[in-house]
């Protein structure tokens, strides 16, 4: 049995909890239930069925606030003690245009957390520990080092680390005990899948991109008309900016990565007014012909750039040539800067699925076979199929769910089935797209991701999040379509979802 966190609803002058409400019965009592931002702890301490103590509620503080295109306000709360973030799920309070609370997503912790340990290693110490755990990677880049405390009061460091351009591809998340330096958890995220000129990708589709022109030729870097910097570097040539004497002489893999990266950035800008991956104008950086240490036939997001390996099939194309794969990788970046879905278990499968669904939509939603554009003599299919996940050995319903699925040909478990179990949500998302159309579906997906989901979200939370987004933006009919799609996969009105027992199944494709 698995129990996801719930959406907490306000009904009349009271607040009740449920995980199956279709929102059609949701009644917002604006006059009775209006809270200011300074009263967020009051909301959490007065929930009718899931109320937490006032002392526990007072440890929550607002760390982010957004207003969406429909006038809904979303306050993201984080639990803190003595200025240190508690490693529990975020909570998001959703308010209508009048300031009335409509729902609360996440999983409030009814516990007053107190620090019961000391920090004996510090940031420099944790860097040494992680470096010693990666002896073959000489140039690690620490993207984030955050001190946190768990519910038991143990201090630890959560560290996001990648490699420098000259190092082997690495993308890792560590949790290191701040008292004795032991590695509590390690997640490997590596294996996922000036002026403007017109460049054509591998399929002769033209794109306008910024470049630098000089007397010696053309270089693939520059700033676009929104102020975002774009660049592609060569993984086989000391990670230098890709350049050539003329347009026709440019590395085609680099052109694919560059044009597709610009296209995906523009998609998010045009449809959701998102200013680059982090919504703050971060550079769009790509590495092509990545070596690991030899030809690396894969692609991944490392926290600051997209990395595309050099294909091991001479007659084939790299993953940079597939617009849906580029959209997939860049959406991992969007997720990292919004919901922050942890790359483990169901939250990790959601992370993968949102990337697949958005990549599919960005590429025109014409082929449900993700990565089909990279097919070659040796790579005859894509990597996943949204319409029929079973084609690649993925489950399509919760009856086939397995959190112990492994990568094909390896003894390593798939981070709790992040790639394997994404097939369930992929099929649900594909059904929603077919029944509501691209425009409505993409808005529901994006809004649920950036406004409702929290880092430890489960499949049932994605259902509630999409229901909320559909209801707010398109009404009861759209919400019914979303509900039916989830019901068809066994993610329905029940608070607990029955799943099969884990087995030694194998993930067919990476």
From Swiss-Prot:
GO terms for cellular component: extracellular region. Its main location: secreted. InterPro entries: FTP_domain (IPR011096), Peptidase_M4 (IPR023612), Peptidase_M4/M1_CTD_sf (IPR027268), Peptidase_M4_C_domain (IPR001570), Peptidase_M4_domain (IPR013856), Zinc_Metalloprotease_M4 (IPR050728). Its EC number is 3.4.24.30. GO terms for molecular function: metal ion binding; metalloendopeptidase activity. Residues 1-30 form the signal peptide. The active site is at 329, 419 (proton donor). SUPFAM superfamilies: Metalloproteases ('zincins'), catalytic domain. Metalloprotease capable of the hydrolysis of insoluble hydrophobic substrates. Hydrolyzes azocoll and gelatin and, at a lower rate, soluble and insoluble collagens. Does not cleave short synthetic peptides. Preferentially hydrolyzes the 24-Phe-|-Phe-25 bond in the insulin B-chain, followed by the 5-His-|-Leu-6 bond. Inactivates endothelin-1, primarily by cleavage of the 5-Ser-|-Leu-6 and 16-His-|-Leu-17 bonds. Hydrolyzes the alpha chain of C3 to generate a C3b-like protein. Inhibits complement-mediated hemolysis and opsinization of bacteria. This is Gelatinase.
């Amino acid at each position: 049995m698995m129990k996801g966190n719930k959406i907490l609803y306000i009904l009349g002058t009271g607040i009740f909890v449920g995980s199956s409400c279709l929102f059609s019965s949701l009644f917002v009592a604006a006059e009775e239930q209006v809270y200011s931002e300074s009263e967020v702890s009051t909301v959490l301490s007065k929930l009718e069925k899931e109320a937490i103590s006032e002392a526990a509620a007072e440890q929550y503080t607002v760390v982010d606030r957004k207003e969406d295109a429909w006038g809904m306000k979303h306050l993201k709360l984080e639990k803190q003690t003595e200025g240190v973030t508690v490693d529990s799920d975020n909570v998001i309070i959703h308010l209508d245009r009048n300031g009335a609370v409509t729902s609360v997503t996440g999983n409030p912790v009814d516990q007053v957390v107190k620090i019961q340990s000391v920090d004996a290693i510090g940031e420099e110490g944790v860097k040494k520990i992680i470096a010693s755990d990666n002896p073959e990677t000489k140039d690690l880049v620490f993207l984030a080092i955050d001190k946190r405390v768990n519910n038991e009061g143990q201090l630890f460091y959560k560290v996001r680390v990648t490699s420098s351009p000259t190092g082997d591809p690495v993308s890792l998340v560590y949790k290191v005990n701040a008292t004795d330096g032991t590695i509590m958890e390690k997640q490997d995220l590596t294996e996922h899948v000036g002026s403007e000129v017109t460049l054509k990708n591998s399929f002769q589709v033209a794109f306008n991109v910024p470049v630098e022109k000089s007397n010696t030729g053309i270089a693939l870097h520059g700033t676009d008309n929104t102020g975002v910097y774009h660049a592609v570097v060569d993984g086989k040539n000391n990670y230098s900016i890709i350049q050539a004497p003329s347009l026709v002489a440019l590395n085609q893999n680099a052109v694919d990565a560059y044009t597709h990266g610009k296209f995906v950035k523009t998609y998010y800008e045009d449809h959701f007014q998102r200013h680059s991956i982090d919504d703050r104008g971060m550079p769009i950086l790509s590495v092509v012909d990545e070596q690991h240490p030899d030809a690396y036939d894969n692609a991944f997001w490392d926290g600051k750039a997209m990395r595309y390996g050099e294909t091991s099939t001479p007659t084939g194309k790299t993953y940079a040539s597939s617009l849906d794969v580029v959209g997939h990788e860049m959406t991992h970046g969007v997720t990292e800067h919004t919901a922050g879905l942890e790359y483990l278990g169901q939250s990790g499968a959601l992370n993968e699925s949102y990337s697949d669904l958005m990549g599919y939509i960005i590429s025109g939603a014409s082929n449900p076979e993700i990565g089909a554009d990279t097919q070659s003599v040796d790579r005859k299919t894509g990597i996943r199929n949204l319409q029929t996940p079973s084609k690649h050995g993925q489950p399509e319903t919760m009856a086939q769910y397995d959190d112990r699925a492994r990568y094909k040909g390896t003894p390593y478990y798939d981070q709790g089935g992040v790639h394997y179990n994404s097939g369930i949500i992929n099929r649900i998302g594909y059904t929603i797209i077919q029944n509501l159309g691209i425009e409505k579906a993409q808005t529901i997906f994006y809004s649920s991701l950036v406004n409702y989901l929290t880092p430890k979200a489960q499949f049932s939370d994605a259902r509630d999040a999409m229901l909320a987004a559909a209801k707010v933006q398109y009404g009861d009919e759209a919400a019914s379509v979303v509900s039916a799609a989830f019901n068809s996969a066994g993610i329905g009105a029940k608070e607990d979802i029955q799943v099969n027992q884990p087995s030694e199944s194998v993930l067919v494709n990476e």
